[in-house]
Amino acid sequence: MRRATPGLRHLLITLVLTACSAPSFATQLTVTDPAGQPLATVMVRERPADGPQLDTSDNGYPAPGVARAVAPEVTRFSDATGRVEFTERDASMEYLVRKPGYQDLAIKPEVETRELNVTLVPETDPIKLAEAKPASVWLGALDLGDRDTKLHFQTQCTFCHQQGNSFIRMERTPEAWGDIIHRMQRYGARLSSQDQRALPERLSAGYRKLRENPQLLADPLPWSPALTGITITEWPLGDIFSQVHDMLVAANGLVYVADNIQDRLYEVDPKTNRVTVYKIPHREGERNGGLLAARLKNFPKHDSTSNAHSLAESRVDGHIFITPSAQRRLVEFDPATKAFTLHEMDEGFYPHTIRVDQKDRVWFTVALSNQVAMFDRTTQRFTMYDLPTRGFREWLNTRYIGAVFKLMSWGVPLANWLPVDRAATGTPLPYGIDITPDGKVWFARLHTDEIGLIDPDSGKITMIATPFKGPRRLRTDAAGKLWITAFPESAIVRFDPATSQFTRFDLPLSPKGGDTPYALNVDRPRGIVWVNGNQSDSLYTFDITSETWANIPMPRRVTFTRDVEFEPDGTAYTAIAHFPGWHVEDGQSTLIRVQRP
């Protein structure tokens, strides 16, 4: 047995050595506490000791069109005996060991080993215990004065990133918070004018109070023994300037991921670990940033004229359709030939979430012009559905939103000049969309607290008020019921079109109210709803039949995800899409696969 070195701070590691001639080997870790008792539900992440070794030859990213093997990271959880095993790998590995309430441990064996005996030491420092808690705990405890203010803040200020992580909760003056809010308004937040004035002082004081009084922070719910048997695999994609937004598990077995900020489409083969990058083309003369050129003018590295956002696949020929939110067009990608086709639109602003219906028509929300678009592949023509507005001011703004952004691109700071109310009047924001089995088109409208229905046969539009704030993204289950995220309310909601009844299910969370579920998807064959837990660094699953929850913690802190996709066997995929990427632990965005036993 080796004695612990001072550098490990009393953490005991015993290495049982194997023959040095072994070319590859499996590794088993046994994790105990200082008394020698086994520790269950310990998260152990195995990763290449030399790092991901990514190709950065194309302005920091892989050269396009060249398939390269990427070594994934694998995470598993210890069983009741404290054991966790990893299959053999041909490269040297290191291990990151984590369990709430204990000190993290990083192990980089100097020799090849088949067995590692690891002792984790309980963390007793209240400050360090608080720092290790997920952002959802800090956000849930943050006092902003009243519930309505908190809900409005969570709706507008968790669009792109967490609130409460270590970067956000650091000491800032009210003036510094005011500068941040000013910049976020230009990025697209619609925080009300009154809250732009009031919140800088409250945020500065609120986070300071929590830092100085860690006893005010609740303990998150404990990790479940059911985590044993789950395997999480991560493929590193992009860099700290990337925003790998939505992804698609295609019928060809490959996974496609869009980098919104760098205009790249990643093609990942989960079986071979080979990754190929394709650059999304643009028209000659188009500016960096596209039609939204002023929005990210101060961002350090921005190589995008399209802002690739959401993806959907045709069931007929496997072509992939991509919404470029910074252009007035639809992008089509042929996975067989790798060719892109750009379909130009005559109107609309900010193509957003996309789906393909049973008749091979492509439907997507057009967020800032308050529309839903349909692209008929047979005729190659677009049909635009104008959604109702909440008055003349909103009609005027959505009608001429292109002119507003044109002025902003010329340096006129309209996003900071124009008054904003808590209803975000002027930007109703149609967001998520899905097609029910009967062919009806349903969408969510984030800022009006509504869902809507389009009958493709008649063109009739029906709007339905929701009994909750912030319906963001929605999906249908096998029975045609809709599942909707209540974004600022830490809940999901089921809507039955047959009865017009809403049923709410709160996320299993401590403290209540600290998470912002951005999106969800339904594994229809198994009746499981998967939910993105953006503040809690987790994915939630909800069994529709038993109405029971489970929580799967993700390996990295600051895991902010925006969608879930499935393989036919129910294996789930998501991707770290935090903006900015340098907030993420290790500064690395990844494609994530979750396999359950």
Describe the predicted segments one by one:
Residues 94-109:
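A short, solvent-exposed loop/turn motif at the edges and junctions
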Residues 240-251, 284-316, 347-359, 391-437, ...:
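Beta-rich, blade/repeat-based domains predominating
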Residues 255-260, 304-306, 313-314, 320-326, ...:
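Conserved beta-strand positions in repeat-built beta-propeller and related beta-rich domains
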Residues 153-164, 199, 203:
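The canonical Cys-X-X-Cys-His
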Residues 50-87:
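Short, acidic Ser/Thr/Gly-rich low-complexity loop/linker segments typical of extracellular
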Residues 561-597:
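Blade-level signature of beta-propeller repeat domains, shared across WD40, Kelch, NHL, RCC1
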Residues 269-273, 334-338, 376-380, 455-459, ...:
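Short loop/turn segments that connect beta-strands within beta-propeller blades
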Residues 27-39:
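Structural motif
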